[in-house]
Amino acid sequence: MKTYCKLLYAFPLLAALFAHSACQANNHLKVNTTTITQLDINRYMGKWYEIARYNHFFEKGMTHVYTEYSLQPNGKIKVINRGIKDGKPKEIIGKGKQPSPKEHPGQLKVSFFLWFYSDYYILELDKDYQYALVGS
């Protein structure tokens, strides 16, 4: 009888914790991904240093990370990520594109492996192109 009562009291507590966790998970998914509405792609090209990030597989454990963007003659963007890992320089070369420059100038796509592209959203950009907030 005592075990049954303990389980009976524990069930509402577990249900409440589960509901709270589900709400927190939902809050995590509701990130504002509104991108900038104007972008001069030529001004965006160049070297950008990372101040903070969520690690991607190719940046895990890296420090002094920066990315260089260069516009290619075919309109694609060359992307080179560089950094230091275990005291040694590392780099990965990828490609980027701007699928809808007129409708969604701040929504780009970046690929570091074959034809698999990830979202690259410019969420904020300084008017002088001195800093940017990027998400996916």
Model regions: which residues?
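A beta-rich soluble binding module of mature secreted/lumenal proteins
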Residues: 2-9, 14-136
